[in-house]
Amino acid sequence: MAAYAIFDVDIYDLERYQDFMAQVKPVLEAAGGKYLARGGAHKVYEGDWNPRRIVMFEFPSMELLEEFYFSDLYQGLKSIRDECSSGRAVAVEGV
């Protein structure tokens, strides 16, 4: 069953964040993931949520998503992301 990660990211160093994105894309794809959304236009329909940048990606399973997310390689790249942005993230299984 497919699994999805959804991030709401507040970027405060765009140049550094772009460096992170360039490095993480091939790692994500090599692990079986694919981007579904990366910072496109979005609209809030309910609540007082004010997302900055929405990033979504899909993996074939939650197991593969977690293998990617908790891998040493991604965690090293995540430290770059943490230096230039803050955010929230969730993972959810598809139907």
Each predicted region: which residue ranges?
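Short S/T/G/P-rich N-terminal loop/turn motif that feeds into the first structured element of a domain
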Residues: 1-54, 59-70, 93-95
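C-terminal structural segments of small proteins and small subunits
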Residues: 62-90
